[in-house]
Amino acid sequence: MNPLMFTLLLLFGFLCIQIDGSRLRQEDFPPRIVEHPSDVIVSKGEPTTLNCKAEGRPTPTIEWYKDGERVETDKDDPRSHRMLLPSGSLFFLRIVHGRRSKPDEGSYVCVARNYLGEAVSRNASLEVALLRDDFRQNPTDVVVAAGEPAILECQPPRGHPEPTIYWKKDKVRIDDKEERISIRGGKLMISNTRKSDAGMYTCVGTNMVGERDSDPAELTVFERPTFLRRPINQVVLEEEAVEFRCQVQGDPQPTVRWKKDDADLPRGRYDIKDDYTLRIKKAMSTDEGTYVCIAENRVGKVEASATLTVRVRPVAPPQFVVRPRDQIVAQGRTVTFPCETKGNPQPAVFWQKEGSQNLLFPNQPQQPNSRCSVSPTGDLTITNIQRSDAGYYICQALTVAGSILAKAQLEVTDVLTDRPPPIILQGPINQTLAVDGTALLKCKATGEPLPVISWLKEGFTFLGRDPRATIQDQGTLQIKNLRISDTGTYTCVATSSSGETSWSAVLDVTESGATISKNYDMNDLPGPPSKPQVTDVSKNSVTLSWQPGTPGVLPASAYIIEAFSQSVSNSWQTVANHVKTTLYTVRGLRPNTIYLFMVRAINPQGLSDPSPMSDPVRTQDISPPAQGVDHRQVQKELGDVVVRLHNPVVLTPTTVQVTWTVDRQPQFIQGYRVMYRQTSGLQASTVWQNLDAKVPTERSAVLVNLKKGVTYEIKVRPYFNEFQGMDSESKTVRTTEEAPSAPPQSVTVLTVGSHNSTSISVSWDPPPADHQNGIIQEYKIWCLGNETRFHINKTVDAAIRSVVIGGLFPGIQYRVEVAASTSAGVGVKSEPQPIIIGGRNEVVITENNNSITEQITDVVKQPAFIAGIGGACWVILMGFSIWLYWRRKKRKGLSNYAVTFQRGDGGLMSNGSRPGLLNAGDPNYPWLADSWPATSLPVNNSNSGPNEIGNFGRGDVLPPVPGQGDKTATMLSDGAIYSSIDFTTKTTYNSSSQITQATPYATTQILHSNSIHELAVDLPDPQWKSSVQQKTDLMGFGYSLPDQNKGNNGGKGGKKKKTKNSSKAQKNNGSTWANVPLPPPPVQPLPGTELGHYAAEQENGYDSDSWCPPLPVQTYLHQGMEDELEEDEDRVPTPPVRGVASSPAISFGQQSTATLTPSPREEMQPMLQAHLDELTRAYQFDIAKQTWHIQSNTPPPQPPAPPLGYVSGALISDLETDVPDEDADDEEEPLEIPRPLRALDQTPGSSMDNLDSSVTGKAFSSSQRQRPTSPFSTDSNTSAAQNQSQRPRPTKKHKGGRMDPQPVLPHRREGMPDDLPPPPDPPPGQGLRQQIGLSQHSGNVENSTERKGSSLERQQAANLEDTKSSLDCPAKTVLEWQRQTQDWINSTERQEETRKAPHKQGVGSEESLVPYSKPSFPSPGGHSSSGTSSSKGSTGPRKADVLRGSHQRNANDLLDIGYVGSNSQGQFTE
């Protein structure tokens, strides 16, 4: 850019800036305060804000000043409690204020500044609010009268701002809007106070700091006395009574007093009642005047006056105010006869006894020997009444105007008869209590003599039977641990010789009641009323009056009146309830009857004690209406009548005839009253019942409806209307007894003792009293069983109410019955109580009304019945299981024998042109089974001779061996098998000391027969049992060959025993091994078979005739049918858990369950039958020379038996379903042998015959190579043993008592001489020579392990080719077969020489196991008796098994056989 242009641009910009700056400054203006701060009063410690807002341009800054000094804010000091807000306001976090330091209180201004100037706000003061605690003046209590004003003063505490005042009454704020209430300057003024204004008043001072309450002050509002009833002026006659009433009210209750003419009343002239009524009994002229009633309390006083005027009346004759009345008093008592009179002038009163001249005057001094006195009011009192005092007493009143008199009779009675029955002072009350609580039922009684307290429940005695119920002091009943059954009505009975009194209450026991009885305080109850006074008497009523007693917590609300009359009842009776007044007339009484009365008061807390008894009072009598007779005369004549009662006569148990005579028949007799009462029994009573004989001339009466067996007291009394004469003497009579008409009640049956007890307890209550019909003397108890021999009877005394019956039989149903017995006989029996003592001796009580169905149900529920049914079901189930097992075993035994029949032309009947197979569907052979069960080979731990080689049939029994005893061989086979024996590898070869047993290896059954032409099909034998024995002393050797020597390896602790068997040839079986036909030639030699195994050494003491039963033609199935049948690979056995013994059905040493099936090539060669016959004749000829010797230094342990139904046998579905065949091209794929797996729990013998070539043989012991496997190999580590994980088999126990331990280390085993010979080899070819060479090589197996291993690998492919080439040979001549057999025998002899070398005894230390290979189950289309068919996975083993059926190979043959495993299951690598 040009420098000139740049300079110009700079100048231009500078000018623009100057111009713009001048314009901005022109718009600025100085600050001005927009919002000024306001005065504020704030409490100490509270936050507040002084607002200040200013505007200006530029924006002004704001500062605050207090009292002229700048205020320090958080801008200056971050710790300051003052904050300058962005708006300019000053914010105080808290107001700081103290007595000495007041930094925040003062006058504040806000100053806003900018460059143009400053602005100052108005002053704002900040004051700190205060309120002290102490009131300057607290209100004081005030007492006012209602209607007067009340003033309460208060001065609040000091504070800033000055606190205001309001008032609270009873903690509620007073509304001063009410007209009567005003608050002025701290004064509360209430005009015209009311009673409702009374209460506690509090003065409250408040400001912004808070509130302060003064001390409370009480305002008491009293009421002045007021008159409810004022006295009134009265005018009365002289001698009349006068009353002035004065009723007042007030608060507090005013006191009332009377004055007369401003002076006190004269004493003795007036009475003042409780209601302040003034009463003057007899007014006199001197009583005239003004009477003033004065009522006064603390807030007032009132007066009311009335005037009394007394007028003198004229002279009046005397009159009775209160007349004396008749009285009946017992001897020794005191009696008073009232007599009140009036008249003008006042009459003089005196008393006189009728017939006596003595006069008794009021205020007369009492004579020393006199018991009579007269009160000033005219009442006569006689103390210590005697019988001589009886009679009439006359009260006379005498004046100048005349005289009057009144009579009253005094009757004196016997002391005992006069005494009233006992009085219950406090009786029980109704209660509701909880279960397990305690009940207290009070009953306090008094009387003369002192009564006895007893208790009844529902009318029956119960004390003594239940220890929970006891009577405490003063008769209180206590019941502990209450139960629901304790609910009922309880009656307290107070009894004495004078009678009895009862009181009842209800006790209700519930789950939710009170725990214990409530004890009432006697002070809460009202006091007893005063003694009732008789004010009026009529013929059927008496008027009583009394005074209330001392009130309790609450005054009495009502009264109860009780009465007693000896002629009516023997106990107190309630005659009036809920009486509200103290004056009451009792009505409904009998005429001319003496009564006693007493009164009780009631309030909500209960009943009071009774009042004192009233004086006896007799109701008025009734005069005959028309006769107008003199009562005195009637009473006198009746008193002279003497009635003589004769002895009553019992007519029936309920009727008695009463007769009497009268000495003189008086004029005034209307009839005779026969009186009787019960004196015995539970309900004995003192109440007399009456039967009136209304004909005066009648002298007899019949009492009916009497109780049976009860004693009655009878007397007769004459009567005339209401007048009654003297009673006759009493007579007693007892009605006749009868048997009780009702059974005992509440019969219960309980168990006694422990659960093993056979005793029961029976308890009961007596029959109802009305049905006892006499005195119960005893109770009879029957315990009746279902048979007479189980009956148990008992008899107990009448006082006993329970009994224990023992010796009952469990399971027997008893019926318990109880009956009461009197002298007349046994009464009604109770309802039977069925009981059963169960298995645990439990007593089962069934209701009598149960139906038969319910009773059956109860029996079915018994444990004994259930246990019996369960046991029976178990026995039936076990029987059925045994039968089913036997039947199944029998059917399997019949179905497992694969037998062929020889044709007439010497040929073989076959199924579908297949050699060795029968047509299962042929109707000519219905006994053949539909399917072949699973193969389970016998497992044994002993050695047996060759004479028992044929006993592998399912039902054949092994013949006994010398020294063996009763030991039976293990037989677990469910299918047919082949057998091959390897003798050259056994240590007992050429030895006559032991006998070997052949080992089965294939699936076609070899039948035991005594004749070459005999077909032996034996049923299963029960002695064919499992005897699996394992030895721990052989380095964990898993499986062994069958052993029949009882003592062999039978020791404990790993010790071995040798059993010496007789060297003499066994003669048990007449058939010889030479007679056993060989199977048809296999396609491929079996690995591990040597031709030398068939070399016979008869010179060593073996008798060939005792060997194995010959068969006409051996049934045999060829292998190599991969292209015809396919294996069902969905059925795969689960690999076993290591350390668990594998199934001998598959894993038995030198055995194989691989199915041998014919190949299509064999079916196409009809010459095979001829070859088979020729080979059989040659084989039998050569085998006759063999001698079997068994030596076994280390017999291997016996493996556990397999689970029943293992997959080695054919399933039914397998035999009924055809599966398409699968191509077997991968059979020829090379195998790689992996490195061995060490330290396995079990390494049983291989499925191959020669254990030297198996994983337990010598061939792999040094090189530690892993043996190949097949899905259907008997190798326990690859297929069969792994199945034990599904069904582990428990450890077997030897007969010696030792448990078989599970082997824990790998082991190996030599080939044993009891191995069965394999089938003959097919026609010779390249493969045959090669295999014989391998056989020769096996003699040096221990010194050339590496070379053997490599030989096996080299020969795999060659063996496959050899197998194919052997299948391509359609026909062989007889000479070729014979030459092959001769080579085979020579090789066997060479093998035996090699075995005798010292190194033959060497045994490797460990063994290997290949990983688990998925096996394949046989195709359903298979026809093998073992239940399997050929597949890819079983080709190798099946070919090896075929070689066993043709000839034995040398041990080296195994190493060079190319195919020993299944390529379809995986490759093996080294």
Swiss-Prot record:
Q: Which residues lie on this side of the membrane: Extracellular?
A: 22-863
Q: Which CDD domains match?
A: FN3, IgC_1_Robo, IgI_4_Robo, IgI_5_Robo
Kindly list the positions at which Phosphoserine occurs in this protein.
1159
The UniProt transmembrane annotation reads 864-884
Q: Which cysteines are joined by disulfide bonds?
A: 52-110, 154-203, 246-293, 339-395, 443-492
Positions of modified residues (Phosphothreonine): 1157
Low complexity bias spans? 1413-1437
**Keywords of the record:** Chemotaxis, Developmental protein, Differentiation, Disulfide bond, Glycoprotein, Immunoglobulin domain, Membrane, Neurogenesis, Phosphoprotein, Receptor, Repeat, Signal, Transmembrane, Transmembrane helix
Q: Does the keyword Transit peptide apply?
A: no
Output the PROSITE patterns linked to this UniProt entry. FN3, IG_LIKE
Bias type Acidic residues, positions: 1215-1231
Quote the biased-composition stretches of kind Polar residues, using this chain's numbering. 1144-1158, 1243-1288, 1328-1343, 1461-1470
- Which stretch is the leader sequence? 1-21
One example of the protein's molecular function in GO is: identical protein binding
Q: What is its main location?
A: membrane
User: Which regions face the Cytoplasmic side of the membrane?
Assistant: 885-1470
Ranges of Pro residues composition bias in the record: 1194-1203, 1315-1325
Compartments reported by the entry: Membrane
Q: Which family does it belong to?
A: Belongs to the immunoglobulin superfamily. ROBO family.
Q: What does it do?
A: Receptor for SLIT2, and probably SLIT1, which are thought to act as molecular guidance cue in cellular migration, including axonal navigation at the ventral midline of the neural tube and projection of axons to different regions during neuronal development.
Q: What is this protein called?
A: Roundabout homolog 2
Tell me the organism: Mus musculus
